[in-house]
Amino acid sequence: DVNGGWSCATTVDAKFRPNGCTD
C-alpha cells in the first residue's frame, strides 16, 4: 500500500485500513 505495508495505524492509511495493514 501507500506506506509500504507498515505503521498504517498512525498514518493516512488508517482512514482506509481501520483494521490495520494487509499489504
UniProtKB/Swiss-Prot annotation:
Matches recorded under Pfam families:
Pilin
UniProt entry keywords in alphabetical sequence: Disulfide bond, Fimbrium
One GO term under biological process is: cell adhesion
Signal sequence region: none
Where is this protein found?
Fimbrium
* InterPro entries with a match to the protein in the record: Pilin, Pilin-like
Broad class of where this protein is predominantly found: other
Q: Name one GO cellular component term.
A: pilus
Q: List the disulfide bonds.
A: 8-21
Q: Where are the transmembrane segments?
A: none
Q: Which family does it belong to?
A: Belongs to the N-Me-Phe pilin family.
Q: How does it assemble?
A: The pili are polar flexible filaments of about 5.4 nanometers diameter and 2.5 micrometers average length; they consist of only a single polypeptide chain arranged in a helical configuration of five subunits per turn in the assembled pilus.
State the protein's name. Fimbrial protein
The species this protein was found in? Pseudomonas aeruginosa
Q: Which gene encodes it?
A: pil
